[in-house]
Amino acid sequence: MMNRRHFIQISATSILALSANRFAMAKGKSDVDLRIVATTDVHSFLTDFDYYKDAPTDKFGFTRAASLIRQARAEVKNSVLVDNGDLIQGNPIADYQAAQGYKEGKSNPAIDCLNAMNYEVGTLGNHEFNYGLNYLADAIKQAKFPIVNSNVVKAGTEEPYFTPYVIQEKSVVDNQGKTHKLKIGYIGFVPPQIMVWDKANLQGKVETRDIVKTAQKYVPEMKKKGADIVVALAHTGPSDEPYQEGAENSAFYLADVPHIDAVIFGHSHRLFPNKEFAKSPNADIVNGTVKGIPESMAGYWANNISVVDLGLTEHKGKWIVTSGKAVLRPIYDIETKKALAKNDPEITALLKPVHEATRKYVSQPIGKATDNMYSYLALLQDDPTIQIVNQAQKAYVEKVAPSIAAMAGLPILSAGAPFKAGGRKNDPTGYTEVNKGKLTFRNAADLYLYPNTLVVVKATGEQLKEWLECSAGMFKQIDPTSDKPQSLIDWEGFRTYNFDVIDGVNYEYDLTKPARYDGECKLINPESHRVVNLTYQGKPVDPKAEFLIATNNYRAYGNKFPGTGDKHIVYASPDESRQILADYIKATSEKEGSVNPNADKNWRFVPITGNDKLDVRFETSPSEQAAKFIAEKAQYPMKQVGTDEIGFAVYQIDLSK
């Protein structure tokens, strides 16, 4: 039987004490075996087709995952199928659907797929809120299964905005062939930070609550109402850091909440169980458990499915979980580079109309480009994929600024970040690749991945410098005296989409200094300053001078980077950043014949000299196209020195120049 302490109630602070406890699964004989099959972070990657490259792929797609789902369920007598959110956004199929809306009986293709596969229940991810609450409500109505979320409440109340949980009665067959009724409770969670990320869509309508506290509130209620077991559908990532109220990544903390029997989690686009977590004090990657509780996270874009097997024994009229194990089943083997799953015929046929419509939608011509736009070097030097976005944002603001008093006469800058630059160092193919010549809406979607809107903030020169210091956390500190290999990019501690390049000013990064801020833009080295030679129009930036910075709603409302947050916002555009980019390409092409995306090289690294044996390395795409681009466009001498275990090409960069 599970060695687990059952509390009626635990306080928020006691979670720290409980974190030291390890719940161990006893290897007992089970009466009923129950399999939970799960998907997470599908992001409307429904087909095995890359719409950005207009080519098929065997590395992702729900059509392939569906065949693994059917296989996993066919192997056992008792199974349930659940989805963990971030379903309806993230792919050109989703963009096409959002552009069409639900008029004339049109339905959401992602929901259609889950309906066809007979999902039992789903939950919401943070990206479900990107298109607004009305669009989300229309999508939820189409689901033939309940969608649960417990920690989003109606503004100004504690009343759940969505159905917080459900308890479903399921007929199960025991190991002797006898049928029983098992009551399975499902509860859903989303990161509280949606109130920042989608503030424009949510403010005044909903509020969020802490994930762990919400679990402590509802799970005992679910047990009182008869739930034999409780499954948490937690759209939140893992963390071994001490629990803090309001944490974005709370999946591991849920293992401390009494009566939760399994946790399906996601959000961070990682894999669990996986060797990445081998050193986690909370995780058992052999059995797929956290503090004894089965937990699983199935990557992203339907590239994996979670399979969680629970053993249950009936004791005095109650079902008790006596064993649990979680594994992942990938659709593609990264090491052998072989597909492990075929397309499911039913789902493939279901998606054929929307697949063809999406290809047509993203193939709309919008203009021409004079040069290739690849993001292979976006973390190393000024980059064309960011340059063109910043050009578009700046041009847009230049049009609206004169009519808005708070903006008139101020210098206009623009901030952009690489959305596709190797993922979280988990995707060697995850780079923006837009060829010169004819451009289509597909290319605009590749250049600007998210359905953000443009927002303008007003910041001082001092805040501008600190903003760039936050971005400088992308890089590890370089020891100028060492002759050992040193990694340049801090993949583990920093997300590439937080590496803002600000156009309109010039600046340099001194990488021999420690980072002033960490990956969450928290001050860690107050005496360190990496940003040097910051100038505007050739003159040093005055710390007290005011600037307008065009950015996106995610960054502007986040209040994470200096110069952002409510008090700095002077203009919030109703237009999507991607559409602004497409319109800019179209208007410029019509006027000048094409757009010129060549980077203006407004930022660079301070040369590190005096050590001929300095060995600094970075990772990027292993493709021949990338190698050719690097040979032609690199601002620094670079040479490939190997390939890492994930498949990234490893380059050595000469930072003395």
Curated annotation (Swiss-Prot):
GO cellular component: outer membrane-bounded periplasmic space
Residues where substrate binds: Y450, Y554, R555, A556, Y557, G558, N559
Top-level division of the source organism's lineage: Bacteria
Example GO BP: nucleotide catabolic process
Pfam families: 5_nucleotid_C, Metallophos
Keyword Hydrolase annotated: yes
EC number of the protein: 3.1.3.6, 3.1.4.16
InterPro entries found in the cross-reference section: 5'-Nucleotdase_C, 5'-Nucleotdase_C_sf, 5'-Nucleotdase_CS, 5_nucleotidase/apyrase, Calcineurin-like_PHP_ApaH, CpdB_N, Cyc_nuc_PDE_nucleotidase, Metallo-depent_PP-like
SUPFAM superfamilies, A to Z: 5'-nucleotidase (syn. UDP-sugar hydrolase), C-terminal domain, Metallo-dependent phosphatases
Entries under Gene3D superfamilies matching the protein: 3.60.21.10, 5'-Nucleotidase, C-terminal domain
Residues binding a divalent metal cation 1: D41, H43, D86, H269
Signal peptide: 1-26
Compartments, as annotated in UniProt: Periplasm
Enzyme class per UniProt: hydrolase
Cofactor: a divalent metal cation
Reactions catalysed according to its record: a nucleoside 2',3'-cyclic phosphate + H2O = a nucleoside 3'-phosphate + H(+); a ribonucleoside 3'-phosphate + H2O = a ribonucleoside + phosphate
GO MF annotations in UniProt: 2',3'-cyclic-nucleotide 2'-phosphodiesterase activity; 3'-nucleotidase activity; metal ion binding; nucleotide binding
Residues where a divalent metal cation 2 binds: D86, N126, H235, H267
Keyword field: Hydrolase, Metal-binding, Multifunctional enzyme, Nucleotide-binding, Periplasm, Signal
Matches recorded under PANTHER family: 2',3'-CYCLIC-NUCLEOTIDE 2'-PHOSPHODIESTERASE_3'-NUCLEOTIDASE (PTHR11575:SF6), 5'-NUCLEOTIDASE-RELATED (PTHR11575)
NCBIfam families per record: CycNucDiestase, PRK09420.1
Family: Belongs to the 5'-nucleotidase family.
Function per UniProt: This bifunctional enzyme catalyzes two consecutive reactions during ribonucleic acid degradation. Converts a 2',3'-cyclic nucleotide to a 3'-nucleotide and then the 3'-nucleotide to the corresponding nucleoside and phosphate.
Protein name: 2',3'-cyclic-nucleotide 2'-phosphodiesterase/3'-nucleotidase
Species of the source: Haemophilus influenzae (strain ATCC 51907 / DSM 11121 / KW20 / Rd)
Lineage, uppermost ranks: Bacteria, Pseudomonadati, Pseudomonadota, Gammaproteobacteria, Pasteurellales
Record gene name: cpdB
